[in-house]
Design a protein with these regions (language model features):
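Class I SAM-dependent methyltransferase SAM/SAH-binding core
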Residues: 56-107
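A short glycine-rich, Lys/Arg-flanked "PGG" loop and its adjoining helix->strand segment in the class I
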Residues: 134-149
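A conserved beta-strand element that flanks and buttresses the S-adenosyl-L-methionine
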Residues: 119
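N-terminal, positively charged/glycine-rich alpha-helical extensions of SAM-dependent methyltransferases
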Residues: 1-26
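Conserved alpha-helix/loop element of class I SAM-dependent methyltransferases that forms part
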Residues: 35-53
Length: 257
């Protein structure tokens, strides 16, 4: 990742975990879902992935581990986290104690058919280009058992040129993404757009706001948090203008034979 994304997913992740740890356990999951882990999105994916208690679920680009912890609490899956940034790995281990491997999504260090299911939330656009995005999808297919499912949250370019996109992001079009999915030997079985994400419950919102207030009280003057806030603002503006769209997709790995 380049500088702006490293600030958000490494340094700020580490700081966010410190804040959540000081505020208490009820803040851990909302704080660690900072970014793409909205409850409505996670609930939709869990409904369509149909995980069962005890199944192994790989979270690729897991960040601080909030979505994986949410899934484990709701469904009883056993999460395995894969995350490239050391600060986010430390945050996930500190808050949830889940197994986490520092690794790139284009070269997952797991054997073929290791897990029952996986998800990858808002990560595809952080790859440095189309070849890396195809590699990520290929790795997801490789590590999931035949007949298993993969959940994606993806941000897609709805226009040829984006106005002032966040640095380091590469947004495929919907057509490009679905071509990549087919080339990886995967099948999209469920697709939905999230133009207007349902507002989280009030207690969730309150905890997120408390974490943000304390994060900015402690670190608001730092260049790392300023950069992360700027990246988030650019992202939000593109979504609001319709230049970017959010999709949730469930993919199926073909059954053996």
């Amino acid at each position: 990742m380049d500088g702006p994304m490293e600030a958000e997913f490494d340094t700020v992740a580490d700081w966010t975990a410190r804040v959540a740890a000081d505020l208490g356990p009820e803040y851990y999951i909302p704080a660690a879902c900072r970014g793409s882990g909205q409850p409505a999105i996670l609930d939709w994916l869990l409904e369509h992935l149909e995980p069962r208690p005890g199944e192994l679920m790989i979270d690729v680009g897991a960040g601080m581990g909030g979505p994986a912890a949410y899934a484990a609490r709701r469904t009883g899956v056993q999460p395995l986290l894969a995350e490239p940034e050391p600060g986010a790995c430390r945050a996930a281990a500190r808050l949830f104690g889940a197994p986490v491997v520092q690794t790139d999504a284009t070269a997952l260090p797991f054997g073929p058919a290791t897990a029952d299911l996986a998800w990858c939330l808002g990560v595809l656009c952080t790859a440095p280009g189309s070849a890396a995005q195809r590699a990520m999808l290929g790795q997801l297919r490789r590590v999931i058992r035949p007949g298993g499912r993969i959940g994606l949250l993806v941000y897609l370019a709805a226009t040829v040129e984006l106005d002032d996109p966040p640095q380091g992001n590469h947004f495929p079009s919907s057509g490009q993404l679905h071509d990549f999915i087919g080339l990886a030997g995967l099948e999209a079985v469920e697709v939905a757009g999230f133009h207007d994400v349902v507002q989280p419950p009030p207690d969730w919102v309150g905890r997120v706001e408390a974490v943000e207030r304390e994060l900015h009280r402690r670190y608001g003057q730092t260049p790392e948090l300023t950069t992360a806030d700027q990246q988030s603002s650019l992202f939000g503006r593109l979504l609001s203008s319709g230049q970017l769209i959010a999709q949730v997709i469930v993919l199926r790995v073909a059954a053996a034979g």
